[in-house]
């Protein structure tokens, strides 16, 4: 039942968008095959006339041939795609090359032949590539949707307590925005946000999901008995049609550094289905950027690259690759977390307005920088994190990936400079970050920094598609040099204080036992009695 319902939803949503003439049939068609190409001789391929059944498919139009007098059995099935060769022959005939068969279709009327020709032309010439296909390499899209089609990956996101709970709180805390409303869930995945919308009272939710996860979302919808509320539609929002406009759009489109994966463009594209004054959850995103100092991280990457500086590795001189190795390591953004005290200045904030910004605005993002340095030290690069706000009628809710907030599966991102720069407190660091979108669903990130009033500058270009996942789960360590008192004396003072409390308790005849509270001890018999 799940797969049948999904297929029905997919066809309804995509047929009108891609090929409005693709769901039709033609009766009384005589089908001939070319028997001799040199003599151009034809022979009837089927006994009697046939009916052609056309239906939309993601690859084009499926052409099914059945006999006029027995439509219960499909004689042959073909796919009409953009690569199909076809040509008109006279007023009622049409030649078409399908797979290994070269066929001539003689229709019952000129009108039927013209309509069938339009079906083929719609697939071959009149179907433009979707916005998504134009901006995305096929191999990248395939890997992307395969990745998000795994239950384990959905689980990883769903188990991000901060992420999932914040979304639920934002939606349920603004139930007035969802009560009896039509909702669109873009990139629905497992459908968890759609379920939250239903919990908030939504009348109808269209859950759009392009990966194979759509089938699992449909199973969850049916097993939770909300199929009358949630309609799962397999496909891309750029390639489907909805039966109506929506009041609210919900999505989780953020990637590393907010913009990675270019899902935000899809989120903005979905606004074509939003009613005037409609809501978007989230409503806007803030990308924060700050200069940082971390000698340990810089040395770690530098020493990795120095592997290629060996002149006698098993008798082989590797040094010719040292420069390229260094370039490769420093082109990788670092995904991990850190103590915010490594930041040398207040972060610069760049805002993306999901309600008003255009898709084109995200193709090239040029962010001017000006930092007033708060501490003297070596600047090793720029740190990035983001916050998003859900602006509801009842309340505003923030989801933060700041190093001061609880950790999420987005972590934070740092981009290193191959040539760090020494800067003093009170100086001004200026420059820019340039994010240029690429067809691999990511960005090339160029950093240019300059110390105002000097000739000192540094730059780097990084590949956001290829980050280094450095997070180990270990507690974040405070930056070196941040202790203002002796850590040793602080520790022993704490121990002495604890010892004094225990001694006092013993004198009073009570001690704390394994955190279970006070107990009294009979010293004579060595017995303990709980109070």
From Swiss-Prot:
Domain SAM-dependent MTase PRMT-type: 141-450
Gene3D superfamilies cross-referenced by the UniProt entry: Hnrnp arginine n-methyltransferase1, Pleckstrin-homology domain (PH domain)/Phosphotyrosine-binding domain (PTB), Vaccinia Virus protein VP39
Top enzyme class: transferase
Keyword set, alphabetical order: Chromatin regulator, Cytoplasm, Methylation, Methyltransferase, Nucleus, S-adenosyl-L-methionine, Transcription, Transcription regulation, Transferase
Cellular component, GO, one term: cytoplasm
Domain of life where this protein originates: Eukaryota
Sequence positions that bind S-adenosyl-L-methionine: 154, 163, 187, 209, 238, 266
Compartment(s) where it occurs, according to its Swiss-Prot or TrEMBL record: Cytoplasm; Nucleus
Residues recorded as bearing Asymmetric dimethylarginine in the entry: 501
GO molecular function, one term: histone H3R17 methyltransferase activity
Chief location category: cytoplasm
Reactions this protein catalyses: L-arginyl-[protein] + 2 S-adenosyl-L-methionine = N(omega),N(omega)-dimethyl-L-arginyl-[protein] + 2 S-adenosyl-L-homocysteine + 2 H(+)
The record's account of how the chain is modified after translation: The dimethylated protein is the major form.
EC number: 2.1.1.319
Alphabetized SUPFAM superfamilies for the sequence: S-adenosyl-L-methionine-dependent methyltransferases (SSF53335)
GO biological process, one term: chromatin remodeling
Coiled coil: none
Any Pfam family: PRMT_C
Family the UniProt entry places it in: Belongs to the class I-like SAM-binding methyltransferase superfamily. Protein arginine N-methyltransferase family.
Subunit structure of this chain's protein: Homodimer.
Functional note: Methylates (mono- and asymmetric dimethylation) the guanidino nitrogens of arginyl residues in proteins. May methylate histone H3 at 'Arg-17' and activate transcription via chromatin remodeling.
Full protein name: Histone-arginine methyltransferase CARMER
Species per Swiss-Prot/TrEMBL record: Drosophila ananassae (Fruit fly)
Source species taxonomy: Eukaryota, Metazoa, Ecdysozoa, Arthropoda, Hexapoda
